[in-house]
């Protein structure tokens, strides 16, 4: 008992000192000075890009490959296509339900309605891009126009001061941007309607995400989570690309490199470890900030990183390779632990102090084995495009193949998915 009390006193003291240091030291530290165990950050940070629409998570090359492989009925693309065609969100009979206000708060809200409608618009757009059937294009555009002409904001009259508005804006913003980017050249989408949509998505989602990344709603940046910063970053980047807005694109990239918060790559990683099983050779496993919180959020960050890095990559900025491919190391750690629901996986762990929730001393088994989309994108990029060893990401991609999308509500509705169809390389 005395030993345990002494341990708690030490933790409290260390945590207090850590918090004081992190909140009161120089601007250089606030901008993301790496912790001592981290590798040297690559100084060659790239802000030079070229936009060739469509270039969010999907490019025309992705669709050309998918069309060819589906027509050949080649695996695994044809299974991915059939998975899409089976989705309840990818049907012409889908009925969207635009809301005047998107609401999310601790008691619930209607944000899933927006998330599901955005997901449906994306899936319908993908069906059009691959099949050429214009009925799917018309259905996607109806959803986008309906929301742009109906919705006036996020938590703007209900719960205006609730921080859940960031989660609604962050996750739903990029979901609406993705199908709009695919439909931008569709002749059936009137220019004036597309312009209305671009103004709507900017006015509705950007200010909330911008405010959060700037001051974290007047709270300490280190008291947040990766899964708060990353969707805000992704929405800002996506709106920037959709609207050809250089300032927003550079804002999102700058936060990835140097942001004051857990979405900054320097702050996302809390430990570097050797693989006890020896499968990851010549590299390390990178422990992410939320591995000690729960696996629902830890696996959520995999997809968010995948979509953010893919969007940048499609513009010529290789964030996948940044800091010696550290995104791969993050994914390998997360995949290794979540491949099974069994709790006997040996996982090294660096204790991490969270200013609000205290010490995380081991990997959390909460929601262990959570399966989300994103693994196909990451596995194919690192293993097939770059030729790198990614054993745990590969195993997770194979486990989930053919990959669908998130359909269980809350943040999972934000998983664009269908990576087997769209990201499998030849």
Model-based region annotation:
Residues 168, 197-200, 220-232, 241-244, ...:
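Short, contiguous, pocket-lining structural segments
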């Amino acid at each position: 008992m005395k030993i345990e009390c002494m341990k708690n006193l030490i933790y409290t003291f260390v945590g207090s000192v850590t918090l004081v240091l992190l909140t009161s030291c120089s601007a250089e530290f606030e901008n993301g000075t790496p912790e001592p165990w981290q590798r040297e950050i690559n100084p060659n940070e790239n802000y030079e890009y070229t936009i060739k629409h469509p270039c969010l998570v999907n490019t025309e090359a992705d669709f050309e490959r998918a069309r060819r492989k589906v027509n050949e009925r080649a695996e695994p693309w044809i299974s991915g296509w059939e998975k899409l065609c089976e989705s309840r969100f990818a049907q012409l009979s889908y009925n969207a339900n635009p809301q005047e206000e998107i609401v999310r708060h601790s008691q619930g809200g209607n944000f899933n309605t927006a998330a599901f409608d955005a997901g449906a618009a994306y899936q319908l757009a993908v069906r059009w891009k691959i099949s050429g059937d214009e009925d799917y294009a018309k259905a996607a555009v109806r959803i986008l126009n309906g929301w742009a002409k109906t919705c006036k904001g996020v938590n703007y009259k209900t719960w205006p001061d609730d921080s859940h508005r960031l989660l609604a804006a962050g996750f739903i913003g990029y979901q609406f941007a993705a199908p709009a980017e695919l439909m931008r050249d569709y002749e059936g989408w009137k220019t004036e309607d597309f312009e209305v949509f671009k103004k709507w998505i900017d006015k509705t989602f950007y200010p909330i995400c911008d405010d959060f990344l700037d001051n974290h709603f007047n709270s300490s940046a280190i008291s947040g989570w990766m899964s708060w910063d990353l969707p805000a970053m992704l929405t800002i980047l996506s709106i920037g690309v959709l609207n050809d807005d250089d300032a927003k694109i550079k804002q999102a990239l700058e936060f990835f490199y140097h942001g004051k918060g857990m979405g900054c790559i320097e702050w996302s990683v809390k430990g570097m470890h050797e693989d006890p099983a020896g499968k990851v050779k010549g590299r390390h496993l990178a422990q992410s900030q939320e591995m000690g919180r729960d696996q629902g959020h830890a696996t959520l960050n995999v997809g968010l990183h995948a979509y953010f890095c893919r969007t940048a990559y499609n513009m010529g900025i290789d964030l996948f390779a940044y800091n010696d491919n550290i995104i791969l190391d993050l994914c390998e750690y997360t995949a290794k632990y979540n491949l099974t629901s069994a709790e006997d996986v040996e996982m090294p762990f660096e204790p991490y102090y969270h200013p609000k929730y205290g010490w995380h001393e081991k990997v959390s088994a909460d929601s262990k084995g959570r399966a989300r989309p994103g693994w196909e994108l990451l596995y194919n990029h690192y293993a097939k495009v770059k030729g790198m060893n990614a054993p745990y990401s590969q195993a997770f991609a194979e486990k989930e193949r053919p990959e669908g999308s998130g359909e269980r509500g809350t943040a999972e509705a934000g998983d664009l998915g269908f990576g087997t169809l769209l990201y499998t390389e030849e």
